[in-house]
């Protein structure tokens, strides 16, 4: 039993560290791709999402193929047994469509919010997803959070908001905000809040599926990627169809962009590992720390970021919140007696 607990703890730690490294590498590669001078049109992020989901599918198929002794028939038998064999397995597979659909809704809400809000309001408000994730973890998974945990989550939300706050000229921010009237702001805030709840619900729902089912992580990722591909293609059609028609699906792609796509694809698999062996709340802390690490590295190496006082305060708050969340409060004599 202790060996199983040790293995689970090791997998939790390893998956969190890998997530921090992967997210940091992804952000830095994205920043580097923005500094590249390229002839012709830039690549479309919507098509990159489609490519990433397809790569996830191929990778998961290969892992199952390998686990079955590199036998194609063995892979097909496992897929049939876990996904198609009975009405129960088919219904179970459809459960994964819920987070996939929620992610599509979330992305569309964020597209809408970006058109209605200035960057500062959008970035700060969207950090509420940290709190909605915690709320759904308590209500859907029965997770118990101490007051120290809630304090840490509130501080984390505030710290990430400060880190992500745009560092541009204040007069520019004011003029940009002035372009949006009151009704735009209300609609934009409503869209961001809805996206926060969508993000929290989808993440925790997928966590519940992973932790309450005997279906392998790779099968679950195949199911999620399958539904996500259709969602990503829908976004391409809604927002970038004209550009794709004019310049092609892979317009603007080069070596760096393909690295971004690969990091995005395998990042999705790492997130699934984190959700299975840790949880969505710890995932939020890992991603927050990677934002700070990538920003600092970008300032140090690429020189495309200015470290402001706001960023420094936010980074300090995030680090403090991380330690506070890991704080184990001493039990009172009464609690110790009851235990």
From Swiss-Prot:
Belongs to the nucleotide-sugar transporter family. SLC35A subfamily. Coiled coil: none annotated. Disruption phenotype: RNAi-mediated knockdown causes no obvious morphological defects. In an srf-3 mutant background, causes accumulation of oocytes in the proximal gonad arms and abnormal gonad arms, such as twists and overturns. GO terms for molecular function: UDP-galactose transmembrane transporter activity; UDP-N-acetylgalactosamine transmembrane transporter activity; UDP-N-acetylglucosamine transmembrane transporter activity. It is found in: Golgi apparatus membrane. It is a multi-pass membrane protein. One of its GO terms (biological process) is transmembrane transport. The keyword Zinc does not apply. Uridine diphosphate-N-acetylglucosamine (UDP-GlcNAc) transporter in the Golgi apparatus. UDP-N-acetylgalactosamine (UDP-GalNAc) transporter in the Golgi apparatus. Apparently transports UDP-GlcNAc and UDP-GalNAc simultaneously, and independently, by an unknown mechanism. Functions redundantly with nucleotide sugar transporter srf-3. May be involved in gonadal development. This is UDP-N-acetylglucosamine/UDP-N-acetylgalactosamine transporter nstp-4. Its main location: Golgi. The chain crosses the membrane at residues 44-64, 94-114, 148-168, 186-206, 224-244, 255-275, 281-301, 305-325. Keywords: Golgi apparatus, Membrane, Sugar transport, Transmembrane, Transmembrane helix, Transport. Pfam families: Nuc_sug_transp. It comes from Caenorhabditis elegans.
């Amino acid at each position: 039993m202790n060996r199983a607990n040790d293995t689970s703890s090791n997998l939790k730690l390893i998956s969190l560290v890998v997530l921090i490294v992967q997210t940091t590498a992804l952000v830095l590669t994205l920043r580097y791709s923005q500094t590249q001078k390229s002839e012709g049109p830039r690549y479309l992020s919507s098509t990159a999402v489609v490519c990433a989901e397809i790569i996830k599918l191929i990778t998961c198929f290969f892992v199952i193929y390998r686990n079955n002794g590199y036998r194609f028939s063995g892979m097909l038998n496992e897929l049939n047994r876990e996904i198609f064999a009975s009405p129960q397995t088919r219904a179970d597979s459809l459960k994964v469509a819920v987070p996939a659909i929620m992610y599509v809704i979330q992305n569309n809400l964020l597209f809408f919010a970006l058109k209605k809000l200035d960057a500062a309001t959008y970035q700060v408000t969207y950090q509420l997803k940290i709190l909605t994730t915690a709320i759904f973890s308590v209500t859907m998974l029965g997770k118990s959070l101490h007051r120290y945990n809630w304090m840490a989550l509130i501080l984390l939300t505030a710290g990430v908001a400060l880190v992500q706050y745009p560092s541009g000229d204040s007069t520019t921010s004011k003029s940009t905000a002035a372009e949006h009237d009151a009704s735009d702001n209300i609609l934009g805030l409503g869209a961001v809040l809805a996206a926060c709840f969508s993000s929290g619900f989808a993440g925790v729902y997928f966590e519940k599926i992973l932790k309450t089912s005997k279906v392998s992580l790779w099968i679950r990722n195949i199911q999620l990627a399958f539904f996500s591909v259709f969602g990503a293609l829908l976004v391409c059609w809604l927002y970038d169809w004209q550009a794709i028609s004019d310049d092609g699906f892979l317009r603007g792609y080069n070596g760096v962009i393909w690295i971004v796509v690969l990091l995005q694809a395998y990042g999705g698999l790492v997130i699934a590992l984190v959700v299975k062996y840790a949880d969505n709340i710890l995932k939020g802390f890992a991603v927050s720390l990677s934002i700070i690490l990538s920003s600092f590295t970008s300032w140090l190496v690429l020189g495309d970021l200015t470290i402001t006082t706001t960023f420094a305060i936010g980074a300090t708050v995030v680090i403090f919140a991380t330690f506070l969340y890991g704080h184990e409060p001493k039990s009172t004599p009464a609690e110790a007696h009851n235990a």
